[in-house]
Amino acid sequence: MKLIEPIYIIKQETRKKQYLELLLLGDEQESMIDRYLECGEMYVMLLTESGSPIGVAVVTDEGDDVCELKNIAISPSFQRHGYGKRFIAYLCQQYKGIKQIMQVGTGDSVQTTSFYRSCGFLYSHTIPNFFVDHYDHPILEEGKFCLLYTSPSPRD
């Protein structure tokens, strides 16, 4: 499959839980999603203006000129075709001038950290045992339990 043009990204103000199936791809515990879904701004990616969603993202205001990409998920059949990268580029552009920093809290598997590095994010810090302390079941990525934060690389 090749990247299909154009894509549409809409801000979803209501009925955010209708996208739970996609949200669970990015965060597998519904109670955690519930903690940020209503207070966050949700975006939905579509291939056509009235088409089915292929991706979702939720961004929260963390205060002090920081926002956080809490969840981003692309439907499995559309993964590894550039949609996630384009979604993140769109979100960074949306918040440019509103927030100084967009951070991402994520598992620290090689695949995940490589993806965020390719989007311009750099390692910021780690919260040891985040998944152990906040999830009702073990969440492992390549045998690791910790959560790390990334921020965009400095721009000239």
Predicted feature residues:
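Conserved GNAT acetyl-CoA-binding A-motif
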Residues: 95-107
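Active-site rim helix/loop that mediates acceptor-substrate recognition in acyltransferases
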Residues: 17-48
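Conserved acetyl-CoA pyrophosphate-binding loop and the N-cap/start of the following alpha-helix
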Residues: 78, 82-90
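Conserved small/polar residues in nucleotide/adenosyl-binding loops
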Residues: 149-156
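Conserved catalytic-core motifs of GNAT/GCN5-like acyltransferases
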Residues: 103-105, 122-145
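Conserved N-terminal entry element of GNAT/NAT acetyltransferase domains
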Residues: 1-14
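A short, internal acetyl-CoA/4′-phosphopantetheine-binding micro-motif in the GNAT/acyltransferase core
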Residues: 72-79, 107
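Conserved beta-strand in the GNAT
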Residues: 44, 52-61, 66-73
